[in-house]
Amino acid sequence: MPYYPGLNYNQNLTDEKIFIRDRLVLLKQELAKSIPQKTVDKTLLLATWNIREFDSEKFGPRLESTYYYIAEIISHFDFVAVQEVRDDLSALKKLMGILGHSWSYIVSDITEGKAGNGERMAFVYDTRKVRFTNMAGELVLPEKKGTKTLQFARTPYIVSFQSSWFKFNITTAHAYYGKGAIGIKRRTDEIRAAALFLKARSIRETKMIKDKKGLINKWDNYSYILLGDFNIIDREDETFKALTKGTNFFIPEGVLKHNLEGTNVKRDKFYDQIAFLKKEDLLEQGSNAGVFDFYDFIFTENDFSHYKKMMKIKGEKNLKSYTEWRTYQMSDHLPLWVELKIDFAKKYLSDIK
């Protein structure tokens, strides 16, 4: 449960505090309607969220209340993959302080160079539900004989975790964007390369957990999840096909059904995705998935007059510039999430012959 030190009830109750309080209450109510209630050991609420330039202070620093809103959203999940964390971890550490002592994170190093954009990948998770199982690394493509392999612009990050009975290797990625045909080709190639790399790794790993009879011990088998911001244009585009065609990765029906309008603010692009590898493992989707559009409740267009004086931008302060400024407060992406079942006790017992 997030902690809001700046709203201490012992301090003077200003108009600004009332404004923040009312929106936090509304946000809590709407999250409770949209996101299933968290369980102790039955389900895992998994999300991916590109939090725009967290935190570059490009349009001025994020407001204290913004951190409260971000923390409130994250706290309704058990595990969140976050893209666009900056080299300076101050913003992430501040967020963790608001989330509370039961939350932890693991973060990658930045990818050097212009294309890397000084970004990190992070996994933020509730330690009451999820534990790190000691493997973390970055995806580096093997060299092909006679050719130079172009590496990822922003190196995908793979980490192993366990939640109840569910063991998973999860990779978060932020695909190259680029411009024109060349940019889209590199983007498509990156998506396909990441998926195929993980497919090959999974096959290799499965061979290592066979018993003396050559049978796979599925209880030692980790599921593979690939998620993040792939800059996918739409579901008919090659960028989408690169994730699933010939890679053994699939996007659950629940995610496809509830992600009909996209995950960008305009709801017309399918940049963010959550994909799972088809294999002999324990992976069972719950009945819920979705995209949470927080702009229906906070930083709304009706709030422009309130925030106008706080906007640190060049040029005129109008509704158009406000809608851009607010994406540097919250994000230009919306969180995409899925519910997974993680209690396999009955399956385990039924396997005992």
Predicted regions span which residues?
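Divalent cation-coordinating acidic motifs and surrounding scaffolds
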Residues: 1-353
